[in-house]
């Protein structure tokens, strides 16, 4: 892998992260926000893999597994919150959380 390949992949990783953050901020549905957060987490994961491949270092793969584990935990907690919010309010609007009492 050359330096220009690494730059291209890092630009792609930054783009994935930016699209994910925009999706989290722009969408009101909690399920869409969870999907956008997964897209945002895939950007740094791609960056770790690319940097590890460029430097011939396996630590990039280790960081990828860490990001993958964190993403799985985030999905589990997020889906549990989504189901609870949907049961309590009847909607998946994340703004409905502010109306909950107690």
Curated annotation (Swiss-Prot):
GO BP, sorted A to Z: ATP synthesis coupled electron transport
Keyword Translocase assigned: yes
GO cellular component, one term: plasma membrane
Alphabetized GO MF terms: NADH:ubiquinone reductase (non-electrogenic) activity; quinone binding
Keywords of the record: Cell inner membrane, Cell membrane, Membrane, NAD, Quinone, Translocase, Transmembrane, Transmembrane helix, Transport, Ubiquinone
Primary site of residence: membrane
Membrane topology type: Multi-pass membrane protein
InterPro entries: NADH_UbQ_OxRdtase_chain4L/K (IPR001133), NUOK/Mnh_C1-like (IPR039428)
Enzyme type, top EC level: translocase
Enzyme Commission number(s) of this protein: 7.1.1.-
Compartment(s) where it occurs, according to its Swiss-Prot or TrEMBL record: Cell inner membrane
Reactions catalysed: a quinone + NADH + 5 H(+)(in) = a quinol + NAD(+) + 4 H(+)(out)
NCBIfam families according to UniProt: PRK05715.1-2
HAMAP family attached to this UniProt entry: NDH1_NuoK (MF_01456)
Biological role: NDH-1 shuttles electrons from NADH, via FMN and iron-sulfur (Fe-S) centers, to quinones in the respiratory chain. The immediate electron acceptor for the enzyme in this species is believed to be ubiquinone. Couples the redox reaction to proton translocation (for every two electrons transferred, four hydrogen ions are translocated across the cytoplasmic membrane), and thus conserves the redox energy in a proton gradient.
Subunit structure: NDH-1 is composed of 14 different subunits. Subunits NuoA, H, J, K, L, M, N constitute the membrane sector of the complex.
Protein name, per record: NADH-quinone oxidoreductase subunit K
The species this protein was found in: Rhodopseudomonas palustris (strain TIE-1)
């Amino acid at each position: 892998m050359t330096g220009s390949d690494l730059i291209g992949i890092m630009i792609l990783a930054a783009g994935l992260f930016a699209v994910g953050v925009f999706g989290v901020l722009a969408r009101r549905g909690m399920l869409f926000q969870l999907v956008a957060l997964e897209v945002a987490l895939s950007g740094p994961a791609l960056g770790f893999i690319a940097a590890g491949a460029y430097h011939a270092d396996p630590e990039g793969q280790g960081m990828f597994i860490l990001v993958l584990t964190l993403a799985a935990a985030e999905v589990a907690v997020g889906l549990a919150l989504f189901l609870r919010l949907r049961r309590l309010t009847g909607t998946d609007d994340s703004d409905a959380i502010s109306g909950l009492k107690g």
